[in-house]
Amino acid sequence: LHSFPTRRSSDLEPQVVKKRQKDISDIDQKIISMYAKGMTTRQISETIEDIYGFETSESFISDVTDKILPQIEDWQNRPLDEVYPILYIDAIHYSVRDNGVIRKLAAYVILGINTEGKKEVLTISVGDNESAKYWLSVMNELKNRGVKDVLIICADGLTGIKEAIAAAFPKTEYQRCIVHQVRNTLKYVPDKDRKAFATDLKTIYQATDEKKALAALERVTEKWTPKYPNSMKRWKDNWDAISPIFKFSTTVRTVIYTTNAIESLNSTYRKLNRQRSVFPSDTALLKALYLATFEATKKWTSTIRNWAQVYGELSIMYEGRLPE
């Protein structure tokens, strides 16, 4: 693999050994850092050869990155807070090679806003078995790690999630993610109409109360249904999971539907998709996701804007459920 210069003078020997050990761990760190940026094992191998002038096999690179697997396990099992005011659940899809066949797998990310108003990734799981049974196991895992109560869970229409939340956390409010709702509505709308349609949708979710929101829903449906017949169907079908937002003040709503927190995290995850079209295994995907998460969350030091006001309002609305 690689050789180190030897020195004849025996009194220098211990120093050389120390230096050599340090160099190896230093290279490990560099390999892990490159992997975190989404580079493939082949790209890392080529970069190591360019920089250090020695060859490393792709399996060696893979073995080095496997050293973080115990760390991932510890992180996935770490104790969590008893109460989270808000959780966001999202899915990002990746192509993964499985016994020579390329499959689409989802990485499910749960992001929490804790009682201090700080963001925290609770867990990441990779799978293709989206169902009420699967989501119930995810919810129970959170409970086993110490979570006793969640006020609001925001998620897209993931199969079975609503039922699983109701079973595991009966008092928790399920809120459809407004950003996804809007995105799904506009998905098949051509550019020429998209801006006007998006502006009209805003009149629904930014309405001051539910009555005005329903009136806006009727107006928008009447206006756009002739041109795009199914575009507004999801709003009517999902209304019971969209409407909880109207009981909150603008400040709280902004925290709930301005999903900057999860959107910025997602852009980090999407970068991985751009850098690799296919992951060699679900373990390789999990390693890349964990390292990308670790990099992204290092910058998360600030509290959510207006958190004191948000917390105060949530404390009144969900009486006795938040620590004072």
Map each language-model feature to its residues.
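Structured nucleic-acid-interacting core domains from mobile-element enzymes and related host factors
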Residues: 55-116, 126
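Acidic/histidine-rich catalytic cores and adjacent linkers
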Residues: 170, 203-324
